[in-house]
UniProtKB/Swiss-Prot annotation:
Record has Ribonucleoprotein as a keyword: no
UniProt cross-references to CDD domains, sorted A to Z: KU70, vWA_ku
Organism from which the protein derives: Oryza sativa subsp. japonica (Rice)
Gene (name only): KU70
Protein name, UniProt field: ATP-dependent DNA helicase 2 subunit KU70
Start and end residues of each SAP domain: 588-622
Source organism superkingdom: Eukaryota
The protein's role, per its UniProt record: Single-stranded DNA-dependent ATP-dependent helicase. Involved in DNA non-homologous end joining (NHEJ) required for double-strand break repair. When associated with KU70, binds to double-stranded telomeric and non-telomeric DNA sequences, but not to single-stranded DNA. Required for the maintenance of chromosome stability and normal developmental growth. Plays a role in maintaining telomere length. Acts as a negative regulator in telomere homeostasis.
Disruption phenotype: Severe developmental defects in both vegetative and reproductive organs resulting in sterile flowers. Hypersensitivity to methylmethane sulfonate (MMS). Longer telomeres.
Amino acid sequence: MDLDPEGLFRDDSDEDDDNVQEREANKEMVVYLIDASPKMFTPATKADEKEETHFHTIVNCITHALKTQIIGRSYDEVAICFFNTKEKKNLQELAGVYVYNVTEREPLDRPDARLIKEFSCIEDSFMSNIGSRYGITSGSRENTLYNALWVAQALLRKGSVKTVSKRIVIFTNEDDPFGGLTGAVKTDMIRTTIQRARDAQDLGLSIELLPLSRPDEEFNMSLFYADLIGLEGDEIVDYLPSSGEKLEDMTNQLKKRMMKKRKVKTLAFAITNDVCIEVNTYALIRSTTPGAITWLDSISNLPLKAERSFICNDTGALIQDPQKRFQVYNDKIVKFSTRELSDVKRVSSHHLRLLGFKPLDYLKDYHNLRPSTFIYPSDEQIFGSTRVFVALHSSMRRLGRFALAFYGNPTRPQLVALIAQEEVTSAGGQIEPPGIHMIYLPYSDDVRYPEEVHLTSDDAPRATDEQIKKASNLLRRIDLKNFSVCQFSNPALQRHYGILEALALGEDEMPDVKDETLPDEEGLARPVVVKAVEEFKASVYGENYDQEEAEAAAAKAGASKKRKALTDAAAEKSAAHNWAELADTGKLKDMTVVDLKSYLSAHGLPVSGKKEALVSRILTHLGK
């Protein structure tokens, strides 16, 4: 078998392994627990003319989350579970709990088109197939909320909490599920339910609540659910949706809260040789691209798995042993094992190592190579990381400095700048969280200096004071107030995914995608804006400026300039030959068509026709 000397230090396999590891670390399993009691089927708001219910709101939110998940988080797994139902469907045979699913799919699995399509229409058949009832009533020891938590925990048994994030999300508008009970029965059922939730949390499961307030009263977290999910003090307020009369506002709030911000990876941050803390990294705003193409089997329609095999050059047989790599040194072949190669390519024992501090004004705009990464501390593995992180963050903010660090990524080690960000809050909540931005810095050979362009004062036109004044007035008239890049979706991507969604769900009509990047014609048609535009045009081009005439004149001048350039080039090329001598000796027929046309172009003669016609035209012009 042949060894691989040139690919000794290639990172192909390492890069693939990193992608798999990062994907597994980002994988999430979610169980949606939906309250199906009769209260969920009452009108959601007082001013609701369509009589839409909280149940309808939840179905819309989960459907939207599933569609988004297929696009951006296709490896996540989801289960949908109703509690307070007449029918039961779960492996534990517990009453009042119904695990919803479709054929050819596991209860906890990646979402598919059939699940989304059938779940979005579940309201039509819910009462007849599943049914709604009050699960916790006086005179009964049945506890459907306890049963639902038990079933959800059982669904989330697969996968390790070290590599998979597991969540239980509860949707309900009942803030006191045990309000109809009294005495020791109520106390005992509350205690066992809270204990069941804490047992699940001890196993690494996260329990979240998305409460919905009824028209007649706000959702009161302190009655029960604050103890269930472990909230205290000001944390309770963050869980309450802001009050609003429109169901659309409530739906938008739920959609935002269902999409949890997830870490990209966990890094070890070495402050000194003896002090190391743990931090999580989060991706910020960056360009979105269409999903990668997945090759499918033509018969089963299942994704294909790519496999790579090595073949011996001598025998043509498959090589079963792992590939070996070597380096020729002093006319000797030095073989490397996989572990030795890994040690050679490891440039740092820590993911992130602090080098020192510099003033913030040393950092320039062009030092930012690509979108930054946000860093936040974690005490999950290294206790006390948050305390050290806060001390470092506060000192950097107070002294106006940034930290210079070495990011020991195996495939591309880089110098990074760590810039502390202060928390920004408003009456509506937190706008920007406290933390540190990791800016990727260039090496010296990455910096490109622009070429100097020498211009005289006559080369570049200068605006007059009147033109600057009119331009400033125009900018004030069309100012975009409260602008944010988050308000605009990429129309090409929206149409791309809209078509895929329509095809997957079997919809007859393609979605109508609104292009929010187009100019606001209604806003630009306002009289004050039109007046500002006309005044600016008049100050630059004059009162009697006609755009069509100007464009026609510019096109004519451009064409004339182009013709002159072609004629000059042809004249220069034809001057290299003695055409009179060529005509006398009969060698014109030996010239190429390009050379013949250069003579004709230089003298303003037609260049059409075959070679014989071109030669005849030249002879006529020469008077031969």
